[in-house]
From Swiss-Prot:
One of its GO terms (biological process) is protein refolding. Residues 2-72 form the PPIase FKBP-type domain. The gene is fkpB. It comes from Escherichia coli (strain K12). PPIases accelerate the folding of proteins. Substrate specificity investigated with 'Suc-Ala-Xaa-Pro-Phe-4-nitroanilide' where Xaa is the amino acid tested, was found to be Phe > Leu >> Ile > Lys = Ala > Trp > His >> Gln. InterPro entries: PPIase_dom_sf, PPIase_FKBP_dom, SlpA/SlyD-like_ins_sf. It holds the Pfam family FKBP_C. This is FKBP-type 16 kDa peptidyl-prolyl cis-trans isomerase. Its EC number is 5.2.1.8.
Amino acid sequence: MSESVQSNSAVLVHFTLKLDDGTTAESTRNNGKPALFRLGDASLSEGLEQHLLGLKVGDKTTFSLEPDAAFGVPSPDLIQYFSRREFMDAGEPEIGAIMLFTAMDGSEMPGVIREINGDSITVDFNHPLAGQTVHFDIEVLEIDPALEA
C-alpha cells in the first residue's frame, strides 16, 4: 500500500462535483458509498489525475477544472440527426430525455434528445457536462485498497 497517490494508484474517495451555478451534479456523500478512482487507466481526465497525485489518506482538496481539462468541449460532430421513424420501437421521445443508442461496434452510448422538429430528431452524444467548468471537493479515504474478489 502506497503512502500517497501515485500515477497507477487505485484511490477510494468521497467526492462532490458541482457546477458553476452551485448545483451538485454528483456526490458520493449523498448515498454514503465512496467511489474508486483508478489512475493511469484513461478512465479519469488528466486534469483530475494531476490534482490527486501526491495526496495522502485523510487529505481533502477542493479544485476546479475548466472544460478542456474535465469533460471536454462540446463537439458538433457528436450531434446527430435521426428520422422519427427510427424511434418507432422506442416510443415517442421527449426533449431532454437520455436514451441508449447502439453504436456501429455494438456498444451502447447515451444520447440526449435536444430537439424534435417535424420528422427530424436531434440527439447530442457529447458528455452531459461537456463545456462546463466543474468544481471538485475530494476526500481521500484509502489508497490501493484491498479489493474483494
